[in-house]
């Protein structure tokens, strides 16, 4: 019987096709973020570029930050707590080149302050990687009054992007067009965006809220592509894979036990370095130069859920909805009191 956790869309993957088809757990032959950089000749070759990452101090964020630093470019690593960030990222930090940026993505005030700080230090931004996130937590509101999963997974990132949008556009070059990379999740299958009740007032359920926010991440990058792709700014979203990180801290222990109990699930799991590989593909893959509006998994464009598969792989039909994407964009501007 085929492993239901293996995507059936590895025909275009070339070098790693077999590794993805023969999953064997964290640290197997599937590529790491640094492998992807090497494959794309990006090691120490981007010294004139600037990158910003959110959610840098835990899980795949650390490995994504490590890969960004390896490009040779200027890197800003967004962290909620500067002291914890310094401890987690100590071996990556390099004064004047790889720096921490205080950023609590769930606080719109913090996002505005961080964007202002960034712009005071840099007039350039080539890739924005929106990686910070939470998953399946109990219902809570942020200080701004937004549902917390929506605020942290999506709305804070939308605000950060909007505040840096003109810098991304002006930094785009013919040889490397600017990119916005949103780390979404297979959890987008759980729900489309609930446009008429986006904060899920009176209908909150933790997985529905997660799906609502993670589909919003996909819609955001699709709409960036629609609006700005022809101007040299591209949006890509992705599923990093199954990685054991602090992201799961709110998940019911029994659910976690079920997730990890089957052999296919154990083999499906990736290390954090492997989990960051798809993010780095979206950010630096030469096959995505000048392209966007796609959802990636396993370092390539995802196809639909394979027959007999599970919702852990593949992309849901509702992930591409041009009408919904425009409505979400307009709603987000209104919620954040922004104008175009």
UniProtKB/Swiss-Prot annotation:
Q: Determine if NADP is one of this entry's keywords.
A: yes
Q: Which residues catalyse the reaction?
A: 184 (proton donor), 210 (proton acceptor), 214 (lowers pka of active site tyr)
**Swiss-Prot/TrEMBL keywords:** NADP, Oxidoreductase
Q: In which pathway does it act?
A: Sesquiterpene biosynthesis
Does the keyword section mention Hydrolase? no
Q: Where is NADP(+) annotated to bind?
A: 60, 84, 104, 131, 162, 210, 214
| Pfam families referenced in this protein's UniProt entry, alphabetically | adh_short
What EC number(s) does this enzyme carry?
1.1.99.-
Q: Which top class of enzyme applies to this chain?
A: oxidoreductase
A GO MF label? oxidoreductase activity
Outline the inducing conditions: Expression and the subsequent production of PR-toxin take place under static culture conditions (oxygen limited), whereas no expression of the PR-toxin genes occurs under the strongly aerated conditions required for optimal penicillin production. There is a negative control of the transcription of the PR-toxin genes by the penicillin biosynthesis gene product(s), or by a regulatory peptide encoded by a small ORF inside the penicillin gene cluster.
Into which family does the record put it? Answer: Belongs to the short-chain dehydrogenases/reductases (SDR) family.
Described by its record, this protein's role is as follows: Short-chain dehydrogenase/reductase; part of the gene cluster that mediates the biosynthesis of PR-toxin, a bicyclic sesquiterpene belonging to the eremophilane class and acting as a mycotoxin. The first step of the pathway is catalyzed by the aristolochene synthase which performs the cyclization of trans,trans-farnesyl diphosphate (FPP) to the bicyclic sesquiterpene aristolochene. Following the formation of aristolochene, the non-oxygenated aristolochene is converted to the trioxygenated intermediate eremofortin B, via 7-epi-neopetasone.
Protein name from the UniProt record: Short-chain dehydrogenase/reductase prx1
UniProt organism field: Penicillium rubens (strain ATCC 28089 / DSM 1075 / NRRL 1951 / Wisconsin 54-1255) (Penicillium chrysogenum)
């Amino acid at each position: 019987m085929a492993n239901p956790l293996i995507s059936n869309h590895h025909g275009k993957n070339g070098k790693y096709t077999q590794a993805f088809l023969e999953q064997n757990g964290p640290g197997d032959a599937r590529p790491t973020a640094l492998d992807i950089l090497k494959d794309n000749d990006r090691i120490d070759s981007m010294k004139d570029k600037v990158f910003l990452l959110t959610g840098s101090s835990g899980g795949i964020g650390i490995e994504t930050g490590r890969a960004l630093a390896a490009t040779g470019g200027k890197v800003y690593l967004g962290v909620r707590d500067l002291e914890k960030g310094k401890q987690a990222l100590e071996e990556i930090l390099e004064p004047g080149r790889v720096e921490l940026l205080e950023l609590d993505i769930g606080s719109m005030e913090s996002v505005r302050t961080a964007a202002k700080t960034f712009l005071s230090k840099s007039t350039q931004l080539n890739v924005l990687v929106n990686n910070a996130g939470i998953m399946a937590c109990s219902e809570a509101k942020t200080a701004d009054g937004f549902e917390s999963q929506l605020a942290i997974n999506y709305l804070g990132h939308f605000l950060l992007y909007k505040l840096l949008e003109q810098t991304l556009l002006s930094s785009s070059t013919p040889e490397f067009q600017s990119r916005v990379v949103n780390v979404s999740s297979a959890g987008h299958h759980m729900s489309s965006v609930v446009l008429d009740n986006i904060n899920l007032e009176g209908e909150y359920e933790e997985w529905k809220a997660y799906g609502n926010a993670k589909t919003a991440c996909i819609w955001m990058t699709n709409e960036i592509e629609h609006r700005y792709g022809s101007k040299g700014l591209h949006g890509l979203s992705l599923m990093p894979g199954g990685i054991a990180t602090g992201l799961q801290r709110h998940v019911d222990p029994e659910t976690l036990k079920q997730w990890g109990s089957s052999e296919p699930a154990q083999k499906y799991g990736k290390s954090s370095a492997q989990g960051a590989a798809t993010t780095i593909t979206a950010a630096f893959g030469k096959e995505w130069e000048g392209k966007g509006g796609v959802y990636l998994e396993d370092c390539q464009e995802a196809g639909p859920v394979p027959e007999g598969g599970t919702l852990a792989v593949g992309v849901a039909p509702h992930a591409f909805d041009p009408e919904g994407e425009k409505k979400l964009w307009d709603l987000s501007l209104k919620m954040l009191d922004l104008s175009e």
